[in-house]
Amino acid sequence: MKHRILSILLENESGALSRVVGLFSQRGYNIESITVAPTEDLSISKITIQTFGDKKVIEQIGKQLHKLIDVLKVTEIEDEEHFKREIMLIKINNTYDQYRKVQDITNAFRGYIISATSNISIIQLSGTNKNLDTYIEIMKKLTNIIEISRSGIISIYKN
């Protein structure tokens, strides 16, 4: 069993998202991350869901999703075929002496300090789940994390 990511294209209609989430809930599948937004065709939305299961479970979820009237296409996101990213905002309590180190680490992760006061910094990062988790672990050792807000995974096909 491992983390799996599904990309679902569906009609951008009232209740469509609710039916997809309801299917997961009714079947006892956990949603670890979900993002939803219209595509370039505003009548179609893309849902990206991260869940946990083996290949057989994911195939079953896909078959059940295809039965929903609004669902147009379901694709499992494979690592080698897609770019995957997530956005994170993190608020930390740091001293003046820690600020320079926070700035250097944030730059190394290609992040931005979007707000800073004498003892609070808010940082924006984008990257893979692993990349963001690594940044969090480094900040836990260096500062006091006040709050974290993560967007959930988004993806796009490489070719």
UniProtKB/Swiss-Prot annotation:
Pfam families: ACT_AHAS_ss, ALS_ss_C. Residues 5-79 form the ACT domain. The keyword Hydrolase does not apply. InterPro entries: Acetalactate_synth_ssu, Acetolactate_synth/TF_NikR_C, Acetolactate_synth_ssu_C, ACT-like_dom_sf, ACT_dom, AHAS_ACT, AHAS_small-like_ACT. PROSITE patterns: ACT. Keywords: Amino-acid biosynthesis, Branched-chain amino acid biosynthesis, Transferase. Gene3D superfamilies: 3.30.70.260, ACT-like. Chain A, domain 2. The keyword Glycoprotein does not apply. GO terms for cellular component: cytosol. GO terms for molecular function: acetolactate synthase activity; acetolactate synthase regulator activity. Dimer of large and small chains. This is Acetolactate synthase small subunit. The gene is ilvH.
